Amino acid sequence: MLAKRIVPCLDVKDGCVVKGVQFRNHEIVGDIVPLAARYAAEGADELVFYDITASAHDRVVDKSWVSRVAEQIDIPFCVAGGIKTITQARELLAFGADKISVNSPALSDPSLISRLQDEFGRQCIVIGIDSFYDAASDSYKVKQFTGDEAATKETAWYTQDWVEEVQKRGCGEIVLNVMNQDGVRGGYDIKQLSLVRQLCDVPLIASGGAGTMAHFRDVFIDAKVDAALAASVFHKAIINIGELKQYLAAEGIAIRR
C-alpha cells in the first residue's frame, strides 16, 4: 500500500495566508514563507498554495513568493491561481514549484489540461474541483471563481462528470474541495469522496472538513483517498502534523514518517 500523504493548504490573498469558512469571510492567518517552513519542519509531505483571487481577477500567481518558498523548504509543493497558458506554468515550475494546479481556467478551457499534460507530463498536473452539494436537487455541482464571493458562479458540470472529463484530458491528480464542509471542521464528506473515489483512477486528495485526528483516519479508511488536505486545524495549531502522523500510524494507516 502506498503511504498516505498529509498536505497543509495555504490560501493566499494579497500576499498573506488567509482562511475562510465555506469559501467566505477570509481572515489573515500568517505570512506565506514562515508558515510553509513551519509545516515542512512538522513533517508535512507536501504543501499546496492557492492564490484564491487570481482567476477571478484575471491574473496569475505572484512568482516572487513561489521562489522564496522554494528556497526555504525541502518538500514538494504545488501552486494554483490563474494559470491559463503553458508559459505561465513553465515559469512557476522554473521558480521552484513541483506541481501546478488548475481549477477555474480548466473549466473555461478544458483543452488546457491536455496541453499542460503534453508539455510537462501527467505527474505534475493537478486539477482542483470546487464541489458544492445542492440539497434541492440532491446533486454535486462544480463551482467556478470561488476565491471571490462576488465572482463565484455555478457551472453546467456535475462533479462526477467533471471528474471523468479531467481524467480523460490528462490530469495526474485531483483535489476535491468540498465547499459545504470547508472550514467548519465537522469531518470530511465521506459519502461524496467515496463516490468520486470509484470514478477516479488517479490519486485523489480530500479537502474540506478536517477538525480532529480521527477525521483524517476516517477519510483514509472509509473513502480510501490518497492524501488529506487541511488548513485551519494546522493554521490554528489545533493539530500538530508530527503528532497526527504518530496517531495515524498507531491506527494502522501507512503514513510517510
Curated annotation (Swiss-Prot):
Q: Which Gene3D superfamilies match?
A: Aldolase class I
Work out whether the entry's keyword set contains Glycosyltransferase.
Answer: no
Which domain of life does the protein's organism represent?
Answer: Bacteria
Q: Is Ribosomal protein there in the keyword field? A: no
Listed InterPro entries: Aldolase_TIM, His_biosynth, HisF, IGPS_HisA/HisF, RibuloseP-bd_barrel
**Localization per record:** Cytoplasm
> Per the annotation, which location comes first and is thus the protein's main one?
cytoplasm
Q: What processes in GO biological process is this protein linked to?
A: L-histidine biosynthetic process
This protein's GO cellular component annotations are: cytoplasm
Q: Which cysteines are joined by disulfide bonds?
A: none
Q: Which GO terms describe its molecular function?
A: imidazoleglycerol-phosphate synthase activity; lyase activity
What EC number(s) has UniProt assigned to this enzyme? 4.3.2.10
Q: Which UniProt keywords apply?
A: Amino-acid biosynthesis, Cytoplasm, Histidine biosynthesis, Lyase
| Active-site residues per Swiss-Prot or TrEMBL entry | 11, 130
Please give the pathway this protein is involved in. Answer: Amino-acid biosynthesis; L-histidine biosynthesis; L-histidine from 5-phospho-alpha-D-ribose 1-diphosphate: step 5/9
Q: Reaction(s) catalyzed by this protein?
A: 5-[(5-phospho-1-deoxy-D-ribulos-1-ylimino)methylamino]-1-(5-phospho-beta-D-ribosyl)imidazole-4-carboxamide + L-glutamine = D-erythro-1-(imidazol-4-yl)glycerol 3-phosphate + 5-amino-1-(5-phospho-beta-D-ribosyl)imidazole-4-carboxamide + L-glutamate + H(+)
Q: Quaternary structure? A: Heterodimer of HisH and HisF.
Role of this protein = IGPS catalyzes the conversion of PRFAR and glutamine to IGP, AICAR and glutamate. The HisF subunit catalyzes the cyclization activity that produces IGP and AICAR from PRFAR using the ammonia provided by the HisH subunit.
- Report the family membership: Belongs to the HisA/HisF family.
**NCBIfam families the record matches:** hisF
Query: What is this protein's name?
Result: Imidazole glycerol phosphate synthase subunit HisF
Its source organism is: Shewanella oneidensis (strain ATCC 700550 / JCM 31522 / CIP 106686 / LMG 19005 / NCIMB 14063 / MR-1)
